[in-house]
A protein has these predicted regions:
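Peptidyl-prolyl cis-trans isomerase
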Residues: 2-245
Length: 245
């Protein structure tokens, strides 16, 4: 007879084989986390502002305004309203638990995760040509954008060499350091990376300012990490048959 495990949140049991099979296919994790979220927010009541903000965020993200004009979408709208309430409840829960930590985390991450940069890029394998372009740009004979359009080796040439907005965490570390220490509209000395020569000019730096947006983002991230950790612990306990529900 197969060995069974009792599942949290449900008055049922599942065989060890089925449990492992669901986990292997990724289904168990999804189901477990959704049940865990539902359990955590069952007594959470978001305020009207949180509900409306969540609704606006979803409408912007998925262009949901068009659904309001279609009668055959009543079922979708009903389920959408339930999803909005659930997400608003999770947001409230995350703020209640982690808002005191959010600003400190923001300050630690700000420079590399949240500040935004635009820059112009010109690159190719010809060192002599890159240095010639560098002198032309420095002397104002030409500009990096026109030169990039004609001579850059990458897809940036389609946008006159302009790249951004970017966060430093998501780009090459050498380019990130140049952007962090440069001034706007100043061409940097040529550098070699990956067998190509690069000219980089920072165009615009937009420092992030702590706001409700970042507070919500950080708190939700911390809640997701907490839930992920709980899932791993619960699954390990299930596999070891140590749960007593």
């Amino acid at each position: 007879m197969p060995e069974n495990r009792k599942l949290p949140f449900l008055d049922t049991k599942i065989s060890l084989f089925d449990l492992q099979n669901l986990e292997k296919k990724g289904f168990f994790k999804t189901i477990f986390i959704e049940l865990l979220k539902a359990d955590k927010i069952k007594n959470v009541i978001p305020n009207e502002l949180q509900i409306n903000q969540t609704k606006q965020e979803l409408c912007l993200k998925y262009n949901l305004e068009q659904l309001k004009n279609k009668k055959d979408n009543e079922f979708i709208i009903h389920n959408l309203n339930k999803e909005i309430y659930k997400l608003a409840s999770l947001k409230k829960l995350s703020l209640d638990k982690f808002s005191s930590q959010a600003e400190k985390i923001f300050k630690i991450r700000k420079d590399y995760h949240y500040d935004q940069y635009f820059y112009s890029l010109l690159r190719n394998k010809n060192k002599s040509q890159i240095y010639e372009f560098y002198y032309q740009i420095e002397s104002k004979e030409s500009n990096i954008n026109d030169l990039s359009k004609e001579h850059s080796s990458g897809s940036e040439k389609e946008k006159l060499g302009i790249i951004g907005p970017v966060n430093l965490i998501n780009i090459n570390s050498e380019i990130a350091e140049i952007l962090k220490t440069s001034k706007d509209s100043t061409i940097n000395d040529p550098i070699e990376m990956n067998n190509e020569w690069y000219l980089i000019q920072r165009e615009n730096y937009k420092p992030a300012i702590y706001s409700e947006y970042y507070e919500n983002q950080i708190c939700l991230e911390l809640l997701e990490k907490e839930i992920e950790k709980e899932y791993k612990n619960e699954y390990l306990n299930l596999m070891n048959n140590k749960l007593n529900f």
